[in-house]
Amino acid sequence: MKIRIDIPHHPYDIQIEKGCLAQAGQWLRELWQPQKVVIVTDNHVASLYAEKVKLSLEDAGFQVAVFDFLEGEERKNLTTVQKVYEFLVKQGLTRSDGIVALGGGVVGDLAGFVASTYMRGIHFVQIPTSLTAQVDSSIGGKTGVNTPFAKNMVGTFAQPDGVLIDPLVLETLGKRELIEGMGEVIKYGLIEDPELWALLTELDGSVESILEHAETLIEHSCQVKRKMVVEDELDNGVRLYLNFGHTIGHAIEATAGYGKVMHGEAVAMGMVQISKVAEKKGLMPAGITQSITDMCQKFGLPVDYENWDVDKLYQALTHDKKARGNTLKLVLVPELGSATIHPVSLEEMKDYLVK
Protein backbone atom coordinates (compact mmCIF):
# COMPACT_ATOMS: atom_id res chain seq x y z
CA MET A 1 0.00 0.00 0.00
CA LYS A 2 1.15 3.53 -0.78
CA ILE A 3 0.12 6.57 1.21
CA ARG A 4 0.92 9.93 -0.36
CA ILE A 5 2.16 12.73 1.87
CA ASP A 6 1.15 15.51 -0.49
CA ILE A 7 3.10 18.45 0.88
CA PRO A 8 3.42 21.03 -1.93
CA HIS A 9 7.16 21.67 -1.70
CA HIS A 10 8.19 18.08 -0.89
CA PRO A 11 5.62 15.32 -1.61
CA TYR A 12 6.62 11.72 -0.90
CA ASP A 13 5.16 8.25 -0.43
CA ILE A 14 4.93 5.86 2.49
CA GLN A 15 5.27 2.32 1.14
CA ILE A 16 3.77 -0.33 3.45
CA GLU A 17 4.29 -3.94 2.41
CA LYS A 18 5.22 -7.17 4.12
CA GLY A 19 8.68 -8.31 3.02
CA CYS A 20 9.57 -5.05 1.28
CA LEU A 21 12.84 -4.66 3.18
CA ALA A 22 14.47 -7.09 0.75
CA GLN A 23 13.63 -4.69 -2.10
CA ALA A 24 15.06 -1.61 -0.40
CA GLY A 25 17.58 -1.07 -3.19
CA GLN A 26 14.99 -1.20 -5.96
CA TRP A 27 12.75 1.16 -3.96
CA LEU A 28 15.57 3.66 -3.41
CA ARG A 29 16.64 3.43 -7.07
CA GLU A 30 13.23 4.81 -8.00
CA LEU A 31 13.86 7.82 -5.74
CA TRP A 32 17.58 8.52 -6.23
CA GLN A 33 20.21 8.06 -8.88
CA PRO A 34 23.06 5.72 -7.83
CA GLN A 35 25.32 7.64 -5.47
CA LYS A 36 27.06 7.40 -2.12
CA VAL A 37 24.74 6.38 0.70
CA VAL A 38 25.35 6.05 4.42
CA ILE A 39 23.05 3.80 6.41
CA VAL A 40 22.66 5.26 9.91
CA THR A 41 21.46 2.68 12.43
CA ASP A 42 22.05 1.40 15.95
CA ASN A 43 24.09 -1.64 16.90
CA HIS A 44 21.05 -3.83 17.57
CA VAL A 45 19.26 -3.11 14.28
CA ALA A 46 22.60 -3.32 12.47
CA SER A 47 23.04 -6.91 13.66
CA LEU A 48 19.63 -7.82 12.24
CA TYR A 49 19.20 -5.84 9.04
CA ALA A 50 22.15 -3.63 8.07
CA GLU A 51 23.88 -6.20 5.87
CA LYS A 52 20.63 -7.16 4.16
CA VAL A 53 19.81 -3.56 3.32
CA LYS A 54 23.41 -2.77 2.36
CA LEU A 55 23.53 -5.63 -0.14
CA SER A 56 20.17 -4.63 -1.61
CA LEU A 57 21.37 -1.05 -2.09
CA GLU A 58 24.67 -2.17 -3.59
CA ASP A 59 22.83 -4.45 -6.02
CA ALA A 60 20.91 -1.34 -7.12
CA GLY A 61 24.17 0.49 -7.86
CA PHE A 62 24.73 2.51 -4.69
CA GLN A 63 28.04 2.92 -2.88
CA VAL A 64 27.17 2.07 0.71
CA ALA A 65 28.77 2.59 4.11
CA VAL A 66 27.21 1.85 7.51
CA PHE A 67 27.42 3.94 10.67
CA ASP A 68 26.01 2.39 13.82
CA PHE A 69 25.91 3.65 17.39
CA LEU A 70 24.90 2.09 20.70
CA GLU A 71 21.13 1.76 20.90
CA GLY A 72 19.05 3.76 23.34
CA GLU A 73 17.28 7.08 23.84
CA GLU A 74 20.21 8.28 25.95
CA ARG A 75 22.38 8.22 22.77
CA LYS A 76 20.06 10.60 20.89
CA ASN A 77 22.18 13.68 21.55
CA LEU A 78 24.58 16.13 19.94
CA THR A 79 27.59 13.97 20.87
CA THR A 80 26.32 11.19 18.63
CA VAL A 81 25.42 13.73 15.94
CA GLN A 82 29.01 14.96 15.91
CA LYS A 83 30.26 11.39 15.43
CA VAL A 84 27.95 10.93 12.45
CA TYR A 85 29.15 14.20 10.91
CA GLU A 86 32.75 13.01 11.21
CA PHE A 87 31.86 9.70 9.56
CA LEU A 88 30.09 11.45 6.67
CA VAL A 89 33.13 13.65 6.08
CA LYS A 90 35.44 10.63 6.06
CA GLN A 91 33.16 8.93 3.53
CA GLY A 92 33.26 12.01 1.33
CA LEU A 93 29.51 12.58 1.29
CA THR A 94 28.42 15.62 -0.71
CA ARG A 95 25.07 17.32 -1.15
CA SER A 96 24.24 14.97 -4.02
CA ASP A 97 24.51 11.94 -1.71
CA GLY A 98 22.12 10.66 0.95
CA ILE A 99 21.38 9.01 4.27
CA VAL A 100 19.22 5.96 4.94
CA ALA A 101 17.78 5.96 8.47
CA LEU A 102 17.38 2.29 9.40
CA GLY A 103 15.95 1.76 12.87
CA GLY A 104 13.47 2.95 15.44
CA GLY A 105 12.52 6.44 16.52
CA VAL A 106 15.91 7.29 18.00
CA VAL A 107 17.69 6.44 14.76
CA GLY A 108 15.12 8.18 12.58
CA ASP A 109 15.08 11.38 14.62
CA LEU A 110 18.86 11.58 14.84
CA ALA A 111 19.60 10.58 11.24
CA GLY A 112 17.00 13.04 9.96
CA PHE A 113 18.55 15.80 12.04
CA VAL A 114 22.00 14.98 10.69
CA ALA A 115 20.72 14.93 7.11
CA SER A 116 18.93 18.25 7.49
CA THR A 117 22.00 20.01 8.90
CA TYR A 118 24.99 18.38 7.20
CA MET A 119 26.11 20.77 4.44
CA ARG A 120 22.83 22.65 5.10
CA GLY A 121 20.83 19.63 4.09
CA ILE A 122 21.20 16.40 2.13
CA HIS A 123 18.63 13.84 1.02
CA PHE A 124 17.44 11.11 3.36
CA VAL A 125 14.87 8.34 3.58
CA GLN A 126 13.33 6.50 6.50
CA ILE A 127 13.19 2.71 6.92
CA PRO A 128 11.59 2.37 10.37
CA THR A 129 11.95 -0.92 12.23
CA SER A 130 9.95 -0.31 15.42
CA LEU A 131 6.19 0.04 15.74
CA THR A 132 6.52 3.54 17.21
CA ALA A 133 8.64 4.64 14.26
CA GLN A 134 6.42 2.95 11.68
CA VAL A 135 3.22 4.58 12.92
CA ASP A 136 4.59 7.93 14.01
CA SER A 137 8.13 9.27 14.16
CA SER A 138 9.30 8.32 10.64
CA ILE A 139 6.48 10.35 9.07
CA GLY A 140 6.05 14.09 8.88
CA GLY A 141 9.55 15.51 8.91
CA LYS A 142 10.19 16.21 12.58
CA THR A 143 13.82 15.54 13.46
CA GLY A 144 15.65 16.17 16.68
CA VAL A 145 17.91 15.21 19.54
CA ASN A 146 17.57 15.45 23.30
CA THR A 147 19.30 17.78 25.73
CA PRO A 148 19.55 17.47 29.52
CA PHE A 149 16.67 19.97 29.69
CA ALA A 150 14.05 18.43 27.42
CA LYS A 151 13.31 15.74 24.84
CA ASN A 152 13.81 16.74 21.18
CA MET A 153 14.76 20.26 22.26
CA VAL A 154 17.14 20.69 19.31
CA GLY A 155 15.65 19.80 15.94
CA THR A 156 14.41 20.72 12.49
CA PHE A 157 11.51 20.18 10.14
CA ALA A 158 12.90 18.17 7.22
CA GLN A 159 10.83 15.81 5.10
CA PRO A 160 12.33 12.51 3.91
CA ASP A 161 12.23 11.53 0.25
CA GLY A 162 10.31 8.40 1.16
CA VAL A 163 9.36 5.99 3.94
CA LEU A 164 9.60 2.20 3.54
CA ILE A 165 7.66 0.17 6.11
CA ASP A 166 7.96 -3.61 6.39
CA PRO A 167 5.56 -4.90 9.08
CA LEU A 168 7.44 -8.22 9.21
CA VAL A 169 10.43 -6.63 10.96
CA LEU A 170 8.23 -6.15 14.03
CA GLU A 171 8.56 -9.89 14.65
CA THR A 172 12.15 -9.35 15.81
CA LEU A 173 11.18 -6.74 18.41
CA GLY A 174 11.21 -7.63 22.08
CA LYS A 175 7.82 -7.73 23.80
CA ARG A 176 8.28 -4.42 25.61
CA GLU A 177 9.55 -2.70 22.45
CA LEU A 178 6.52 -3.87 20.46
CA ILE A 179 3.96 -3.02 23.13
CA GLU A 180 5.25 0.51 23.69
CA GLY A 181 4.36 1.33 20.09
CA MET A 182 0.73 0.69 20.92
CA GLY A 183 0.72 3.89 22.97
CA GLU A 184 0.84 5.88 19.73
CA VAL A 185 -1.67 3.61 17.98
CA ILE A 186 -4.18 4.04 20.82
CA LYS A 187 -3.64 7.80 20.60
CA TYR A 188 -4.60 7.83 16.91
CA GLY A 189 -7.85 6.05 17.66
CA LEU A 190 -8.68 8.54 20.38
CA ILE A 191 -7.94 11.76 18.50
CA GLU A 192 -9.20 10.95 15.01
CA ASP A 193 -10.10 7.37 14.09
CA PRO A 194 -13.09 5.65 15.79
CA GLU A 195 -12.74 2.73 13.34
CA LEU A 196 -9.22 2.12 14.63
CA TRP A 197 -10.47 2.35 18.21
CA ALA A 198 -13.14 -0.25 17.39
CA LEU A 199 -10.48 -2.59 16.02
CA LEU A 200 -8.36 -2.12 19.13
CA THR A 201 -11.40 -2.95 21.24
CA GLU A 202 -11.79 -6.25 19.38
CA LEU A 203 -8.15 -7.33 19.81
CA ASP A 204 -7.25 -9.36 22.89
CA GLY A 205 -4.11 -7.31 23.61
CA SER A 206 -1.63 -10.14 23.04
CA VAL A 207 1.61 -9.79 21.10
CA GLU A 208 0.19 -12.27 18.61
CA SER A 209 -2.87 -10.09 17.97
CA ILE A 210 -0.68 -7.02 17.44
CA LEU A 211 1.53 -8.81 14.93
CA GLU A 212 -1.43 -10.39 13.13
CA HIS A 213 -3.08 -7.01 12.59
CA ALA A 214 0.11 -4.95 12.33
CA GLU A 215 -0.35 -3.92 8.71
CA THR A 216 -3.88 -2.62 9.38
CA LEU A 217 -2.82 -0.82 12.56
CA ILE A 218 0.06 0.83 10.69
CA GLU A 219 -2.13 1.87 7.75
CA HIS A 220 -4.78 3.45 9.98
CA SER A 221 -2.14 5.29 12.00
CA CYS A 222 -0.28 6.55 8.93
CA GLN A 223 -3.51 7.83 7.39
CA VAL A 224 -4.24 9.93 10.49
CA LYS A 225 -0.68 11.23 10.53
CA ARG A 226 -0.85 11.98 6.79
CA LYS A 227 -4.02 14.02 7.16
CA MET A 228 -2.62 16.22 9.90
CA VAL A 229 0.85 16.67 8.42
CA VAL A 230 -0.54 17.68 5.01
CA GLU A 231 -2.89 20.19 6.62
CA ASP A 232 -0.36 21.55 9.12
CA GLU A 233 3.23 20.64 8.27
CA LEU A 234 4.89 23.00 10.75
CA ASP A 235 2.88 22.06 13.83
CA ASN A 236 0.90 25.25 14.38
CA GLY A 237 -2.66 23.89 14.22
CA VAL A 238 -4.27 20.46 13.88
CA ARG A 239 -0.93 18.65 13.89
CA LEU A 240 -0.73 19.57 17.56
CA TYR A 241 -3.49 16.99 18.13
CA LEU A 242 -0.81 14.35 17.64
CA ASN A 243 0.67 15.51 20.94
CA PHE A 244 -2.16 14.09 23.05
CA GLY A 245 -0.44 12.60 26.10
CA HIS A 246 2.95 13.92 25.02
CA THR A 247 3.15 17.03 27.19
CA ILE A 248 3.31 15.01 30.39
CA GLY A 249 4.80 12.02 28.56
CA HIS A 250 7.89 13.93 27.49
CA ALA A 251 8.27 15.29 31.01
CA ILE A 252 8.20 11.74 32.37
CA GLU A 253 10.88 10.65 29.89
CA ALA A 254 13.12 13.59 30.79
CA THR A 255 12.80 13.25 34.56
CA ALA A 256 13.18 9.46 34.52
CA GLY A 257 16.40 9.71 32.55
CA TYR A 258 16.30 9.04 28.81
CA GLY A 259 15.83 5.36 28.04
CA LYS A 260 14.42 4.39 31.44
CA VAL A 261 10.79 4.89 30.34
CA MET A 262 10.04 4.14 26.69
CA HIS A 263 8.27 6.78 24.61
CA GLY A 264 5.01 4.90 24.07
CA GLU A 265 4.89 4.01 27.75
CA ALA A 266 5.28 7.68 28.68
CA VAL A 267 2.57 8.67 26.19
CA ALA A 268 0.19 6.13 27.72
CA MET A 269 0.79 7.48 31.22
CA GLY A 270 0.47 11.03 29.91
CA MET A 271 -2.87 10.33 28.22
CA VAL A 272 -4.29 8.79 31.38
CA GLN A 273 -3.09 11.60 33.67
CA ILE A 274 -4.29 14.41 31.38
CA SER A 275 -7.66 12.72 30.89
CA LYS A 276 -8.16 12.13 34.61
CA VAL A 277 -7.74 15.81 35.46
CA ALA A 278 -9.58 17.09 32.36
CA GLU A 279 -12.51 14.79 33.12
CA LYS A 280 -12.71 16.17 36.67
CA LYS A 281 -12.70 19.69 35.23
CA GLY A 282 -15.56 18.80 32.87
CA LEU A 283 -13.35 19.20 29.79
CA MET A 284 -13.53 15.54 28.76
CA PRO A 285 -16.55 13.20 28.97
CA ALA A 286 -17.27 11.09 32.02
CA GLY A 287 -15.79 7.62 31.77
CA ILE A 288 -13.23 8.35 29.08
CA THR A 289 -10.30 8.08 31.49
CA GLN A 290 -11.38 4.58 32.44
CA SER A 291 -11.74 3.63 28.76
CA ILE A 292 -8.22 4.87 28.02
CA THR A 293 -6.85 3.16 31.12
CA ASP A 294 -8.50 -0.14 30.24
CA MET A 295 -7.24 -0.01 26.65
CA CYS A 296 -3.66 0.76 27.69
CA GLN A 297 -3.66 -1.96 30.33
CA LYS A 298 -5.09 -4.51 27.91
CA PHE A 299 -2.04 -4.10 25.71
CA GLY A 300 0.34 -4.12 28.68
CA LEU A 301 1.12 -0.41 28.79
CA PRO A 302 1.76 1.31 32.14
CA VAL A 303 -0.82 3.86 33.26
CA ASP A 304 0.91 5.27 36.34
CA TYR A 305 4.47 6.48 36.88
CA GLU A 306 5.87 5.21 40.17
CA ASN A 307 8.45 7.99 40.60
CA TRP A 308 5.94 10.82 40.24
CA ASP A 309 7.52 14.11 41.37
CA VAL A 310 5.36 17.16 40.67
CA ASP A 311 8.21 19.67 41.00
CA LYS A 312 10.55 17.81 38.64
CA LEU A 313 7.80 17.17 36.11
CA TYR A 314 6.73 20.80 36.20
CA GLN A 315 10.31 21.96 35.63
CA ALA A 316 10.51 19.71 32.57
CA LEU A 317 7.19 21.09 31.30
CA THR A 318 8.57 24.63 31.26
CA HIS A 319 10.81 23.54 28.36
CA ASP A 320 7.95 22.06 26.32
CA LYS A 321 8.16 23.01 22.63
CA LYS A 322 4.42 23.72 22.52
CA ALA A 323 4.83 26.54 25.04
CA ARG A 324 4.23 30.06 23.78
CA GLY A 325 5.35 32.51 26.43
CA ASN A 326 3.68 31.32 29.62
CA THR A 327 0.97 29.36 27.81
CA LEU A 328 0.90 25.68 26.88
CA LYS A 329 -1.33 24.24 24.17
CA LEU A 330 -2.78 21.18 25.87
CA VAL A 331 -4.46 18.54 23.70
CA LEU A 332 -7.73 17.10 25.01
CA VAL A 333 -10.27 14.62 23.62
CA PRO A 334 -13.81 16.02 24.07
CA GLU A 335 -15.25 12.89 22.46
CA LEU A 336 -13.88 9.66 21.03
CA GLY A 337 -12.32 10.31 17.63
CA SER A 338 -12.02 14.07 18.11
CA ALA A 339 -9.35 16.32 19.61
CA THR A 340 -9.14 19.97 20.57
CA ILE A 341 -6.55 22.46 21.80
CA HIS A 342 -7.04 23.80 25.32
CA PRO A 343 -4.58 26.63 26.13
CA VAL A 344 -3.48 26.65 29.76
CA SER A 345 -1.02 28.80 31.67
CA LEU A 346 2.10 27.14 33.02
CA GLU A 347 0.74 27.84 36.48
CA GLU A 348 -2.54 26.10 35.67
CA MET A 349 -0.58 23.18 34.24
CA LYS A 350 0.34 22.28 37.81
CA ASP A 351 -3.28 21.14 38.26
CA TYR A 352 -2.71 18.48 35.62
CA LEU A 353 0.22 17.06 37.57
CA VAL A 354 -1.78 16.42 40.74
CA LYS A 355 -2.52 12.75 41.26
Swiss-Prot record:
Pfam families referenced in this protein's UniProt entry, alphabetically: DHQ_synthase, DHQS_C
One term under GO cellular component: cytoplasm
Listed InterPro entries: Dehydroquinate_synthase (IPR050071), DHQ_synth_AroB (IPR016037), DHQ_synth_fam (IPR030963), DHQS/DOIS_N (IPR030960), DHQS_C (IPR056179)
Cofactor binding: number and manner: Binds 1 divalent metal cation per subunit. Can use either Co(2+) or Zn(2+).
Function description: Catalyzes the conversion of 3-deoxy-D-arabino-heptulosonate 7-phosphate (DAHP) to dehydroquinate (DHQ).
Organism placement in taxonomy: Bacteria, Bacillati, Bacillota, Bacilli, Lactobacillales
Name of this protein: 3-dehydroquinate synthase
PANTHER family, alphabetized: 3-DEHYDROQUINATE SYNTHASE, 3-DEHYDROQUINATE SYNTHASE, CHLOROPLASTIC
Keywords, ordered alphabetically: Amino-acid biosynthesis, Aromatic amino acid biosynthesis, Cobalt, Cytoplasm, Lyase, Metal-binding, NAD, Nucleotide-binding, Zinc
UniProt-recorded Gene Ontology molecular function terms: 3-dehydroquinate synthase activity; metal ion binding; nucleotide binding
Family: Belongs to the sugar phosphate cyclases superfamily. Dehydroquinate synthase family.
Biological or metabolic pathway of the protein: Metabolic intermediate biosynthesis; chorismate biosynthesis; chorismate from D-erythrose 4-phosphate and phosphoenolpyruvate: step 2/7
GO process terms (BP): amino acid biosynthetic process; aromatic amino acid family biosynthetic process; chorismate biosynthetic process
